[in-house]
């Protein structure tokens, strides 16, 4: 590899124009393809997506487990095209179009347009992005605003004006309101200042700190909401406490990153971390590595400490990873390696597009109970139809369940036809629905209770009248299904505690 000094001038204008046009055309076409794929998808809303939709029906400055931006986005998309699965998910491909464009622009500013092209395409075709672009979760706006904040930071590092500080403040603030993981950006700023001369000089500019402080101020309404709600969001992380040191979860997390970022990007990133002090890396390379390091290090450490390390928790690390890995591989002239990375991503994208259209017919032999690989996101629409029909015929005034999964799904797929409550056994709320839809003895009755337990005897002494309505079974794939029992309950005795344990 040959060393390139920071601030190397971009290539000729014709090349810039050509590569910019190629990039925009490719990502625009892929965005349209993803939107078309959503139209033909047979996949139901995931429980998280359905929960975020419920939030959008009750706009606030905070919710049990997340800041509020995802709800506002869902509400906005609902005003445009309604509340179908396709419409709820439509913003995701658009946000990733924007994120990839921002990665392209940041890489072009730091290096050149060719690096920008490869970095932007690596972002757009990363398997994790292709997966995430099919669903509407908090990672979608988070990565967009992280990329925007990084572009503004790079512009300021290159001596940009106060206008870029305003962009940084807005991006950082909106990112915090998308997901608290945006706070890793602060660690990236500090770490970059230790390893890059340009980044160190930027730390001395008041405009940077004013921008970051302005972004933090944008989280004030959410902080006040948490204070008024007994810091419910902090309580949502109570499960992630120290149990016993383990290395299994962090190792699985690191292995998963090869699938999330792609084997070329993440493999190259690990090599760059290993040779961080190499003379072949310049200050800009190290600054980008500095932004990638905090999420990865924190999540690995948390995995060792608590045994919790989900594959998507370090997603912000990938934004600068796309840039620095592309820069190093372009400088080394490793075109086949770059192309192989994009080819891997394109194959993953194609499989997801096809899989979503045949999800209800897709099964993979040899995986045992997990052969129906879409079973987590199938059958919920059918459950909503069956429960709604049974509620009408039985004369139920409300529906109740005892798990978050069914509460989230029925709340969306019943579309307000009946109130849906959760009968939780926890003395303190453990999720959003525990907090806002708890089953109470003085609520509407009779109650259609949908449960995995088929024993009517469990309600003895809790309800005066119990009617066994039989079972409900919905397919969750070609070889799998979910089976529930339904009971009509009335005459609740007070106080109504948690649901009795299912008898053997």
Functional labels for PLM-detected ranges:
Residues 311, 335-395, 404-419, 425-428, ...:
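Membrane-proximal, lumen/periplasm-facing interface regions of secretory-pathway glyco-
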Residues 38-52, 61-73, 82-87, 379:
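Extracytoplasmic catalytic/substrate-binding loops of multi-pass membrane glycan-assembly enzymes
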Residues 128-142:
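Short acidic/glycine- and proline-prone juxtamembrane loop motifs at membrane-interface regions
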Residues 185-285, 291, 295-303:
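Transmembrane-lumen/periplasm boundary regions of multi-pass, lipid-linked membrane glycan transferases
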Residues 27-30, 119-127, 131, 172, ...:
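Short helix- or helix-capping micro-motifs
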Residues 108-114, 149-164:
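Membrane-interface transmembrane helices that cradle and orient dolichyl/undecaprenyl
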Residues 90-111, 148-149:
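Transmembrane-helix motifs of polytopic, lipid-linked glycan transferases
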Residues 119-120, 152, 164-179, 214-216:
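Membrane-interface alpha helices of multi-pass inner-membrane proteins
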């Amino acid at each position: 590899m040959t060393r390139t000094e920071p601030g190397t001038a971009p290539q000729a204008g014709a090349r810039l124009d050509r590569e910019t046009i190629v990039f925009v055309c490719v990502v625009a076409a892929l965005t349209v393809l993803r939107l078309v794929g959503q139209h033909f998808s047979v996949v139901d809303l995931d429980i998280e997506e359905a929960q975020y939709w419920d939030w959008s029906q009750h706009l606030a400055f905070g919710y049990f487990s997340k800041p509020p931006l995802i709800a506002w986005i869902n509400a906005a998309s609902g005003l445009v095209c309604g509340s179908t699965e396709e419409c709820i998910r439509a913003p995701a491909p658009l946000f990733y179009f924007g994120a990839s464009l921002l990665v392209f622009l940041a890489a072009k500013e730091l290096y050149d347009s060719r690096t920008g092209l490869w970095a932007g395409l690596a972002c757009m075709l990363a398997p994790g992005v292709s997966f995430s672009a099919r669903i509407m979760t908090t990672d979608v706006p988070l990565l967009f605003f992280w990329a925007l904040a990084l572009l503004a930071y790079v512009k300021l590092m290159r001596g940009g004006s106060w206008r870029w500080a305003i962009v940084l403040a807005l991006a950082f603030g909106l990112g915090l309101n998308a997901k608290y993981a945006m706070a890793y950006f602060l660690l990236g700023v500090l770490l970059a200042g230790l390893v890059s001369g340009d980044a160190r000089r930027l730390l001395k500019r008041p405009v940077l700190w004013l921008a970051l402080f302005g972004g933090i101020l944008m989280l004030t309404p959410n902080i006040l909401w948490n204070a008024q709600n007994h810091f419910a969001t902090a309580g949502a992380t109570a499960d992630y406490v120290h149990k016993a040191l383990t290395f299994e979860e962090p190792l699985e997390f690191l292995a998963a990153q090869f699938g999330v970022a792609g084997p070329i990007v993440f493999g190259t990133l690990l090599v760059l971390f290993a040779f961080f002090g190499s003379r072949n890396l310049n200050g800009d390379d190290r600054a980008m590595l500095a932004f990638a390091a905090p999420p990865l290090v924190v999540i690995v450490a948390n995995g060792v400490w608590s045994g919790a390390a989900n594959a998507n928790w370090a997603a912000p690390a990938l934004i600068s990873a796309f840039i620095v890995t592309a820069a190093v591989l372009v400088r080394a002239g490793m075109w086949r390696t770059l192309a192989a990375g994009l080819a891997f991503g394109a194959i993953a994208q194609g499989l997801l597009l096809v899989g979503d259209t045949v999800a209800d017919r897709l099964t993979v032999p040899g995986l045992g109970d997990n052969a129906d690989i879409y079973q987590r996101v199938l059958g919920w629409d059918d459950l909503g139809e069956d429960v709604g029909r049974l509620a009408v015929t039985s004369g139920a005034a409300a529906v109740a369940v005892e798990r978050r999964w069914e509460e989230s799904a029925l709340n969306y797929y019943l579309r307000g036809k009946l109130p849906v409550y959760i009968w939780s056994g926890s003395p303190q709320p453990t999720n959003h629905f525990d907090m806002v839809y708890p089953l109470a003895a003085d609520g509407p009755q009779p109650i259609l209770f949908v449960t995995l337990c088929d024993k009517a005897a469990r309600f003895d002494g809790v309800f005066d009248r119990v009617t066994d309505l039989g079972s409900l079974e919905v397919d969750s794939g070609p070889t799998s299904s979910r089976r529930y029992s339904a009971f009509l309950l009335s005459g609740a005795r007070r106080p109504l505690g948690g649901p009795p344990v299912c008898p053997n």
